[in-house]
Amino acid sequence: YLTDRNLLQEPAWQCESRQELLENARQDDCLMARVETAGPERIQGYSVILGDDNACYDKFLVLFPEDTQGQREADRKVWTMNILPAYRQELEENLPDQKNVALGGFCVKRKTEQLPPGNYGIAVLAVHRISKLKLWNTTGKYMTEEKHV
């Protein structure tokens, strides 16, 4: 489902410590995170917090490098980016019992040379603006960043 009249968000990835980013965060299926496209041009999907007001959360796209075997937990890095809300009419139609889900979409442009080459698992982190509750969940999707020439 194409995001309705939304522009592709310019990527602004930041490298962070996985341990610090997910400190006090709970992996929870109440954060429904889905990626529909993770191709060479864009990452597109949606995320919805079930049972809470979605307007109260800041959301971040999180990329987990797959090649972290042998690294200590404290040394593991992830790539994060604040995602801007994109209108998704079908979320509102299909989840009428959930609050403020229409802006649950995201569509981020892929640009080469912003990430190190490798395979990445894609997840979403949601932070409540008032209580600072942190929820995260994987999307079950992966993407590959090719070597830069």
Language-model region placement:
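Basic, ligand-binding patches in group-transfer machinery
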Residues: 1-149
